[in-house]
């Protein structure tokens, strides 16, 4: 994939340095002298600032605790995966054949990392304001209703309220394992009900994995 025009159109930004967008789209499995991990590191910090400032201005009466919860619900793997899919980012990523055959183009972790890298690349070339314009536009397109109730949802609390009402029990959370290097660990958590596993999920922290697993469990119990 050497034609990035459609991706740039969706971003509403054209890279002057094409090597920068190539690096942002290169997964480490592709075995080039470069990959997108450094740009991902930068993009993660840039997005944290952009979303933090956006929420600070949007909710002038909300305290730090509420703002942190809302930001955490947007600035995470599932949140960035949603934005990546909005611009069909998976179609442009450079992957190894093994990763390609392992459905790598649709992996949340891979999509999320590539999105962070793209924003990091935009920031390097065009600055914070342009990175902000792109990020906020996509954020608002994917979340037409950004408000306290819809974005500060605590899935663990919601699951507990549901299971206590319907089963008279409190859900449990069991650590199944962790993988990856120390600076980039991924944790797997299982939600149990009456000692039976009802959902599992992975996340960048134990809390993140618990929230994801609780969300999956909620959806399953409501069917």
Curated annotation (Swiss-Prot):
It is found in: Cytoplasm. One of its GO terms (cellular component) is cytoplasm. SMART domains: DSRM, RIBOc. Residues 4-127 form the RNase III domain. GO terms for molecular function: double-stranded RNA binding; metal ion binding; ribonuclease III activity; rRNA binding. Pfam families: dsrm, Ribonucleas_3_3. It comes from the Bacteria. InterPro entries: dsRBD_dom, RNase_III, RNase_III_dom, RNase_III_sf. Keywords: Cytoplasm, Endonuclease, Hydrolase, Magnesium, Metal-binding, mRNA processing, Nuclease, RNA-binding, rRNA processing, rRNA-binding, tRNA processing. Its main location: cytoplasm. NCBIfam families: RNaseIII. PANTHER family: RIBONUCLEASE 3, RIBONUCLEASE III. Belongs to the ribonuclease III family. Homodimer. This is Ribonuclease 3. It comes from Sulfurovum sp. (strain NBC37-1).
